[in-house]
Amino acid sequence: MNFKYIVAVSFLIASAYARSVQNDEQSLSQRDVLEEESLREIRGIGGKILSGLKTALKGAAKELASTYLHRKRTAEEHEVMKRLEAVMRDLDSLDYPEEASERETRGFNQDEIANLFTKKEKRILGPVLGLVGNALGGLIKKIG
């Protein structure tokens, strides 16, 4: 009789444990589903915010371009445009480094070559940063 009692109690404990494991799995899967749904919502909101920012930046760029296109340029703006054209030429030469390096580096040693490219980077970055700063300053003045 004791053996039957032990087997019955063991069976009840095993079935209760199996039910608790099954309930845990269901609650975990429900939590996973809820987490996935919330992540999808967050990604959707983030995507909408990014697309709004892209649209705003495109609009600001168009406004800035139209401002410079439809009015007379000052001497300073003309100088900025010349620098921008020079930067674009330098960037084009960076797209084809073999040709540019062959033309510019004939007869130089490695240190002179490194100095040449460092100067070129400074020549490119300086006007670009200046243009970006001027554009942002103009936008801030318009907004303010």
Swiss-Prot record:
Q: Which organism is it from?
A: Bombina maxima (Giant fire-bellied toad)
Give the modified residues of type Isoleucine amide: 143
Q: Which InterPro entries does the entry mention?
A: Bombinin
The text of the family note is: Belongs to the bombinin family.
- Per the UniProt entry, the signal peptide is 1-18
Q: Where does the UniProt entry say this protein principally localizes?
A: secreted
Query: In its UniProt entry, what is this protein called?
Result: Maximins 3/H3 type 3
UniProtKB keywords = Amidation, Amphibian defense peptide, Antibiotic, Antimicrobial, Cleavage on pair of basic residues, Cytolysis, Fungicide, Hemolysis, Secreted, Signal
- UniProt GO BP: defense response to bacterium; defense response to fungus; killing of cells of another organism
Keyword Signal included in the entry's annotation: yes
Q: Where in the cell is it found?
A: Secreted
